[in-house]
């Protein structure tokens, strides 16, 4: 058997459905994961439209307690901008990138070392702001989402793969590679972008657990995956 695959499970937007439906399943299988949070309480904005039904965490004391508990259990919390709008990001990347890091760190008392580009929109100005803000790694998205454990990586434009309904882990996992996979809505289109049902998410995690238990896969946070590749 060659090197096991590394798999980093990531979740964008801080949607409540992720915490209510995905986290209990992740806990059941003892999988760490990375959650990229938007640093405000407004509805999610996508392509210029508001989606008030896509309920985000609202940074209440209850939510902060929930997130701190997840951190203690090995989850990673990363940043995903302040306003989740490309015009604001292009106009003031320093505020969007640095502000989201400061918001998370001040409330959760933990380092936010990872950033996720909203809509996978990466420009040199935004990338520079991410580096200057002190992040250690960030991911965009070109839908390949895997790296050989020994190939060079642009740590400030790491690729990822959006997971869709009815996908099987066996269709994309490869030994000796680091896979960064992304989830948004867990449920229906009323819950978030590109949703998969709770049943499908559970089935995918059950399949991933079989790979993990066989020694073929190690599930790690995004920052831990980056750390391991830097050492390889």
Predicted feature residues:
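C-terminal domain-boundary segment and adjacent tail
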Residues: 1, 28, 33, 105, ...
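Metal-dependent polysaccharide deacetylase catalytic core of the NodB/CE4 family, i.e.
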Residues: 6-7, 27-126, 145-147, 151-153, ...
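C-terminal anion-handling pockets and recognition modules
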Residues: 172-177
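Boundary/entry segment of secreted carbohydrate-active catalytic domains
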Residues: 3-17
């Amino acid at each position: 058997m060659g090197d096991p695959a590394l798999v980093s499970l990531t979740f964008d937007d801080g949607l409540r459905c992720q915490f209510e439906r995905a986290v209990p399943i992740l806990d059941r299988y003892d999988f760490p994961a990375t959650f990229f949070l938007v640093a405000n309480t407004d509805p999610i904005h996508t392509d210029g439209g508001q989606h008030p039904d896509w309920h985000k965490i609202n940074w209440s004391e209850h939510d902060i307690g929930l997130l701190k508990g997840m951190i203690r259990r090995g989850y990673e919390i990363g940043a995903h901008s302040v306003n989740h709008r490309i015009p604001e990001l292009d106009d003031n990347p320093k505020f969007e990138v640095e502000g989201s890091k400061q918001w998370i760190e001040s409330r959760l008392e933990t380092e936010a070392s990872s950033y996720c580009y909203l809509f996978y929109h990466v420009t040199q100005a935004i990338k520079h702001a991410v580096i200057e803000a002190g992040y250690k790694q960030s991911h965009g998205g070109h839908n390949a989402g895997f790296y050989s454990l020994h190939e060079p990586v642009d740590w400030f434009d790491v690729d990822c793969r959006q997971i869709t309904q009815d996908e099987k882990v066996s269709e994309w996992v490869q030994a000796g590679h680091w896979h960064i996979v992304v989830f948004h809505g867990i449920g229906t289109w009323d819950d978030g972008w590109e949703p998969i049902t709770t049943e499908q998410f559970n089935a995918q995690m059950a399949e991933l657990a079989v790979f993990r238990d066989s020694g073929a896969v190690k599930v790690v946070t995004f920052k831990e995956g980056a750390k391991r590749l830097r050492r390889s």
